[in-house]
Amino acid sequence: MASYAVLGATGNTGQALINILLQSPEKKIHAYCRSKQKLLRLTPQLAGNKNVKVFEGSLNDTAVIADCIRGSRAVFLAVAVPDNMPGMTIAQDTARVTVNALQRIRAENEKAILPKVIVLSSAKLDDKLCQNMPNAMKVLVKLATSNQCADLKESQRILTAERHWISSTFMMPGGLVQDAQKGHALSLETEKTPLSYLDLAAGMVEVADAEDEYHMKNVSVIPTGTGVKFPYESLLEVVKGLLAHYFPWTYRYTGAMPMPVLPQKTA
């Protein structure tokens, strides 16, 4: 029975991954979160499920992360900040602790089979995947997610530097929305918006179960069903993202997360 580790089990993508994995009784789930209480509140069906093991702790705790991903077929890096928070480092922090955890596992047993690393990223980072997006829209979206993009780029750089011993795949969907699972396809050529979190998760699991054809590749997930809801709330997020890009201090009043302490500029 294969195990799958989900880092960021309480987030939108993490919750979708857990729901997709629960559809297959032969799959075991290792769910990492900072609050087990919150996870069980969001997904009460996990309580008492013998195929689910919850790992609770700080994202900086290499031992906890190593325990979570040890023996798994794949580890999904789905820890994320949902907006354009200035100074965010959550994606690169997750990449670093994953590398450290895999180093620990390899040090314990040099013959250990390491899991694939399936990384939640964004189509905004790949011009090829965004080739069908109007240029003006592309510029606007990149500005509105500038801090998020910088964090994701650094995360990808960290994992790419370890490609000789860690197999990573970078999942790059377009705009995401909460909706039912309606069908998906994997694409190396283009993104398509909107896409439901559940269809994204199904695509991520498909990559995890594939052979090595997606090693170190940027992979998008596109919807194949019809009637996917348009995320109208994303229009407001674009405005708030632009404010965070040009006037970082506004995030204190508009952001979804506590305002981080930003480094002081020197003269």
Swiss-Prot record:
Molecular-function annotations in GO: monooxygenase activity
Top class in the EC scheme: oxidoreductase
One Pfam match: NAD_binding_10
Signal peptide (UniProt feature, chain positions): none
Record pathway: Mycotoxin biosynthesis
Keywords: Monooxygenase, Oxidoreductase
Highest taxon in the source lineage: Eukaryota
EC number(s) stated in the UniProt entry for this protein: 1.-.-.-
InterPro entries according to UniProt: NAD(P)-bd_dom (IPR016040), NAD(P)-bd_dom_sf (IPR036291)
Role description: Oxidoreductase; part of the fragmented gene cluster that mediates the biosynthesis of dothistromin (DOTH), a polyketide toxin very similar in structure to the aflatoxin precursor, versicolorin B. The first step of the pathway is the conversion of acetate to norsolorinic acid (NOR) and requires the fatty acid synthase subunits hexA and hexB, as well as the polyketide synthase pksA. PksA combines a hexanoyl starter unit and 7 malonyl-CoA extender units to synthesize the precursor NOR.
Family: Belongs to the avfA family.
Protein name: Oxidoreductase ordB
Name of the gene this protein is made from: ordB
